[in-house]
């Protein structure tokens, strides 16, 4: 109902869906990072009373985690039918939300493994209302994962990088790199592969043809 406050999980769902609905969101890693990260971060920051600086730090953390996950797979998730925003977003947003919540390393690991089980979104749903909801679900999944981890819920040791974890399961040809993420904090995707901002509210792959037509 209008004027009534909702939970952080619901806020992330609604705002993430709305952010992706117009197709005017930023682009990187064959996905739309801010569409997932910002709704999750704003919802959690408001819930926990985090400062603007801490929210920005959470964004950078989430972006770096997203870049790290993306770098592990050389083949296209789209070609396999996966929507990268939906399948990578929950883990990146969970890392950001766990930072804002102040979870320790053990609880953060649980939250990330839970997020690996919350992923999903297929290309077959492109062109429908389900596609923007992929982003909303990814954002809300982060809050849900952090809530469960904080409450003592359990999950596998490594739901993301294990031989039977998410990255291996998603990999189109089983060629994913599952080595430890030793580059986090020393290699910065936010500077080497920064966000790209759209000129037009359509899929980014259409921008060059649009420019050619307009020229």
Regions found by a protein language model. Give the residues of each.
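N-terminal core-entry segment
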Residues: 1-193
